[in-house]
Amino acid sequence: MPIQVLPPQLANQIAAGEVVERPASVVKELVENSLDAGATRIDIDIERGGAKLIRIRDNGCGIKKDELALALARHATSKIASLDDLEAIISLGFRGEALASISSVSRLTLTSRTAEQQEAWQAYAEGRDMDVTVKPAAHPVGTTLEVLDLFYNTPARRKFLRTEKTEFNHIDEIIRRIALARFDVTINLSHNGKIVRQYRAVPEGGQKERRLGAICGTAFLEQALAIEWQHCDLTLRGWVADPNHTTPALAEIQYCYVNGRMMRDRLINHAIRQACEDKLGADQQPAFVLYLEIDPHQVDVNVHPAKHEVRFHQSRLVHDFIYQGVLSVLQQQLETPLPLDDEPQPAPRAIPENRVAAGRNHFAEPAVREPVAPRYTPAPASGSRPAAPWPNTQPGYQKQQGEVYRQLLQTPAPMQKPKAPEPQEPALAANSQSFGRVLTIVHSDCALLERDGNISLLALPAAERWLRQAQLTPGEAPVCAQPLLIPLRLKVSGEEKSALEKAQSALAELGIDFQSDAQHVTIRAVPLPLRQQNLQILIPELIGYLAKQSVFEPGNIAQWIARNLMSEHAQWSMAQAITLLADVERLCPQLVKTPPGGLLQSVDLHPAIKALKDE
């Protein structure tokens, strides 16, 4: 047989073998198209498990008349246009194969209208060459897709369909997964004319737990522990069930999403299972609903035609990040249950027609996500900023210079109890408790200060060391420990291990948590000032220092650590210097009254002024 180009219908049917596995696959592809179109309401009508009819109606932006024929063609899409787009996919669909593949194994009709059009248009493809016919129709703004007689022209595929109930259960599961991914969209599902599911959109700032309970059940909701974990461009949010109360029914709840895309990923499941293994039996599985947000450039979703899998560029980092996030929440084991909404669900009612939606290009707009209402917010992972509510709009420190300047001119609150009420002094008198005003940065690491007409130079690295020592020195309560994203495991000698065991209580007060075995020690947590340090260098040096000591005082250890920390700033900026001085004045007020050697040096300008006047 000679090499020849396959007819369009045959080529599409081959592609359909990868994309269209069963009716649930059709529903998934079409609903994802609706979400990409910016729909806020999606109605799904199913008949006979999807074998007879699948109808998807939405109020998205619609498709222009001139693009309807292209919409049913292979490799035609509005979601990517270049290789750069393919490397950072933010839409659910992007391959441009779904509609062409579905239309090749069914009788598909596409009806759509944009806000700019006065009338709707309907398109359908038929024949060996898949010629598209377009005609006018009546339809509100949005799109309706009807898929009739799925696999009517491929009897072998139709023969492999299961019972009507089984196929609809697969569709129901797909809708449950999509409803958990998009709390802001109303989704209605009906089967054989009867409404089966109604997931109402959660208003902005509303409680997502109501939909979570409707989908996953009250049992999961009562045992759910909220996760809010962040590290650089990685964010993990969602819920994981307490492993101590996991039942076989709960173990079936395993929903994971990567950048809003529902996913079954072995790497993610392994990380969660590993975090829960100490509390789960050999035959038990964790229950979770987790949302992983990652830089689109760091994940490849173009792996499987049905987009069930992804490939992470830094899979080990992602694995350890998820493991640490889940483990940290399980270690807290808060007992307060998630808030339940006892308001009864209204009885199902008839579904009205889709309302007219705005016809703007929703796909080009950034997705607005609502904050999760967590019961617990863990400490940020290594190199991360504190986890912020969704979305993260925390301003940078540069925008707060005015506030910092104001703090520099105020008297820090006295630590001792006042003996008697005294009249408040004017703000200008507070200069006696301040280093002064930062004029400029000299030689990249010194701040030129002015106070009461006097000029002085302050060594910023020395001020930073004093600040870190104050931050590391425990007060009435131990220093807060920050769990490491990846614990540091080191080999130690017998002498070093003995010293660590003797200093364990003092190190715990400093926020350093470790676990030792025969010849190794594993550092599991460190205080916040150490998070940006190279621990593979600092910790061995600290162990060597402890091995030479006979008395282990937290203050002495804090002083040694502060003097051996590497500075985070090779060159200081004005904003960084102002922030540092504000922190030093707040935590170390004694340094303002009695500056130690090497911190502050007065600058006498009188000789220079006199020389200028003499000339």
UniProtKB/Swiss-Prot annotation:
The entry's protein name is DNA mismatch repair protein MutL
Gene that encodes the chain:
mutL
Q: What is the lineage of its organism?
A: Bacteria, Pseudomonadati, Pseudomonadota, Gammaproteobacteria, Enterobacterales
Q: So what family is this one in?
A: Belongs to the DNA mismatch repair MutL/HexB family.
Mind telling me which residue stretches traverse the membrane in this protein?
none
Q: Which Gene3D superfamilies match?
A: 3.30.230.10, Histidine kinase-like ATPase, C-terminal domain, MutL, C-terminal domain, dimerisation subdomain, MutL, C-terminal domain, regulatory subdomain
**Molecular function as annotated in GO:** ATP binding; ATP hydrolysis activity; ATP-dependent DNA damage sensor activity; mismatched DNA binding
Composition-biased stretches (Low complexity):
378-391
Q: Which GO terms describe its cellular component?
A: mismatch repair complex
UniProt KW keywords:
DNA damage, DNA repair
| InterPro entries registered for this protein in UniProt | DNA_mismatch_repair_CS (IPR014762), DNA_mismatch_repair_MutL (IPR020667), DNA_mismatch_S5_2-like (IPR013507), HATPase_C_sf (IPR036890), MutL/Mlh/PMS (IPR002099), MutL/Mlh/Pms-like (IPR038973), MutL_C (IPR014790), MutL_C_dimsub (IPR042120)
